[in-house]
């Protein structure tokens, strides 16, 4: 496991530390979910061979530093009884605050259109594994409000926008946690240098012309999403965004104002807020 140390000034009432993880992608399955689910292991495990080891080491680091784990999604690669049991065992013994990714609700990885109806098939079972509301929640630590939002499907929803406005009303400095990074030219260029699409939220349509048709549909922002992104860009209480999804460590600046920090697939980012 790679460990990165980052210090972020935010106006905390006292310094504190969190461990930022993302994209662990546990790949447990057994015959309780049928052979099709078991077959996913051979396909998916080679992409995430160290997931179990990384999570265990992050857990030990959390205990050593007495620091909570703030996870920005894809802790599991797909929904299975074995994966959910592993997650529940971990969250029962560690302080974990979660912002979900798209894979938290993935049944067989890419077999169907991912939308609210698809997500809701497994939402209750996944939610039962975590102590916070995995669709939207807030947690205040030493005067800093960490707002977790589920944007795994490249969209914000109206209730999330209203929730965010309510959190702004608390008047505290805020750190947003979400799985999918928001569009930034630097991030876009990095992704498009080797991918057919950027896998970012809110990419301007003129920059999506060359996307594969299915990825264009998947990643096209709607009106609510664009409005909420503009709100985030302009709200001075929002100080940082913690993200994942792209599987590498990266730092950019959203809307030329908000530092956006991505933590990669086998990294534990130890962040001290001051």
Language model segments and positions:
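Extended active-site neighborhood of metal-dependent phosphoesterases/phosphodiesterases
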Residues: 6-10, 80-175, 198-202, 251-273
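Short, solvent-exposed beta-strand-terminating loops
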Residues: 13-36, 105-106, 177-200
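Active-site glycine-centered loops adjacent to acidic/histidine catalytic or metal-binding residues
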Residues: 23, 73-74, 101-102, 179, ...
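N-terminal active-site segment of His-dependent metallophosphoesterases
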Residues: 1-82
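Acidic/histidine-rich helix-loop elements
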Residues: 22-53, 106-130, 186, 217
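His/acidic metal-ligating clusters that form di-metal
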Residues: 57-68, 154-253
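The substrate-binding groove and active-site-proximal loops of carbohydrate-active enzymes
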Residues: 44-48, 73-77, 150-155, 214-219
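Structural motif
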Residues: 18-20, 70, 146-148, 175-177, ...
């Amino acid at each position: 496991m790679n460990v990165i140390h980052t210090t972020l000034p935010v106006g905390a009432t006292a310094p504190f530390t969190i461990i930022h993880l993302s994209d662990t992608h546990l790949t447990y399955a057994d015959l309780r979910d049928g052979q099709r689910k078991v077959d996913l292991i051979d396909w998916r495990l080679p992409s995430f061979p160290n997931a179990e080891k990384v999570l265990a080491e992050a857990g030990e680091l959390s205990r050593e530093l007495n620091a909570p784990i703030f996870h920005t999604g894809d802790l599991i690669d797909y929904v299975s009884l074995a994966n959910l049991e592993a997650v529940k065992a971990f969250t029962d013994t560690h302080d974990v605050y979660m912002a979900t990714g798209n894979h938290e609700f993935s049944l067989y990885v890419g077999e169907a259109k991912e939308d609210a109806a698809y997500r809701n098939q497994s939402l209750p079972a996944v939610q039962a594994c975590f102590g916070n509301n995995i669709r939207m929640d807030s947690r205040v630590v030493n005067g800093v409000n960490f707002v977790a939002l589920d944007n795994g499907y490249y969209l914000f929803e109206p209730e999330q926008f209203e929730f965010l406005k309510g959190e702004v009303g608390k008047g505290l400095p805020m750190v947003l946690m979400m799985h999918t990074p928001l569009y930034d030219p630097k991030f876009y260029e990095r992704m498009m240098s080797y991918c057919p699409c950027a896998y970012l939220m809110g990419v301007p349509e003129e920059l999506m012309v060359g996307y594969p048709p299915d990825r264009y549909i998947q990643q096209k922002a709607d009106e609510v999403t664009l409005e909420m992104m503009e709100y985030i860009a302009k709200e001075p209480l929002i100080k940082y965004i913690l993200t994942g999804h792209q599987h590498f460590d990266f730092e950019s600046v959203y809307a030329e104002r908000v530092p956006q920090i991505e933590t990669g697939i086998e990294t534990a980012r130890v962040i001290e807020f001051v």
